[in-house]
Structure formats: structure tokens, C-alpha cells
Amino acid sequence: ILEDASVMSFFYLNDDESLFYLHTHPTEDRPTVVFINALIGQTEMWEGYIGKTLRAHGFGTLSYNFRGQVETRFDPLKELSPNLIVDDLIKLLQATTPKRPVLVGLSIGGLFAAQAIQNGVQAAGLVLINTLRKPGLRLDWINESTHRAFKAGGRDLLLDLMAPML
């Protein structure tokens, strides 16, 4: 079920769970760019310069937050697994029917986008940003630093450190 409000839109997965999303249709014969967050991401990362620039050139945009991210409702007892996140993305795309979607995934969002395509989503394109890094000492350091930064300064510090240009 979709509910549109003047400021926010929600896709209801069931009575107790919903995803926050923002969807603007293209104004020309252009695709819709669908943004898939990193685990620490949210719609506001995409809706600033990137989203405004795309919309100014006639592209549609669709950004949303995973369960557990800002403005979503979710069952805290439910395991937020990658499969669940991909299933939610597929359901949201089926409900919103974006025109010629181009999936753009940041970090693990790129993996979720690719898995959605593997599971039948018809996409006009796929863009991966900083996705699927090789495991090793550098990635271990990044993961540990991310955890420590979140403990020290919360989500805002993490966004400043990990996605300052978005």
C-alpha cells in the first residue's frame, strides 16, 4: 500500500513496518535514478546536489530508507538480513513502478541493487559506488574505525566521515 503526503511518503510492508521514500517522476523521456543507501545512509544523502541536479535535467529520482534507517517503522525482533533488504527493494519498485529505473548503489547498497536485478528487477542500468571491496587489512581497519566513530559521535559523525560529498 502506498500513502503519499506532501512532505513524506511511506510504503507499508505490513501494519507495523514501513519504508520512508521520496519519488519524483521524470519530466522528460528520461529514466528514474533509484538510490540504494549504504548501511549508514539515508535519503538526504541523495536528495541534495545529486538529486536536484538530476531532476533539473529531467530525470526521475527515487530514494528510500531501509528498515531501521530514518523515518522507517520496523519490528525490532525481526532480523534485518540482506535478503530482507533486497526483498523490500523489489517490493518498493513493484509498488512505485519507476520509469526505466537505473539502480545506483553506494557501498553495500550496490550489492543489494545487483541482487535485486538477479532476482528479476528490470533495470535500464546499474551504477556501483565503492561496492564490493576486497576483504583484507584495509577493509578490517575501515570496519573497526567505522564502529569506533559511531560509538564516539553517532550517525552524524559517521556521515561526515564516510559520505561528506553526498
Each language-model region and where it sits:
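Active-site loop/oxyanion-hole signature of alpha/beta-hydrolase fold enzymes
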Residues: 48, 60-102
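Conserved HGGG/HGGXW glycine-rich cap/lid loop of the alpha/beta-hydrolase fold
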Residues: 17-74
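Flexible "cap/lid" loop of the alpha/beta hydrolase fold
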Residues: 111-118, 122-153
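N-terminal cap/lid segment of alpha/beta-hydrolase-fold proteins
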Residues: 2-19
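The conserved SAM/SAH-binding core of class I Rossmann-like methyltransferase domains
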Residues: 62-64, 106, 129
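Histidine/lysine/aspartate-rich catalytic loop segments that bind and position anionic ligands
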Residues: 158-166
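Conserved alpha/beta-hydrolase "nucleophile elbow" surrounding the catalytic nucleophile
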Residues: 37, 101, 105-107
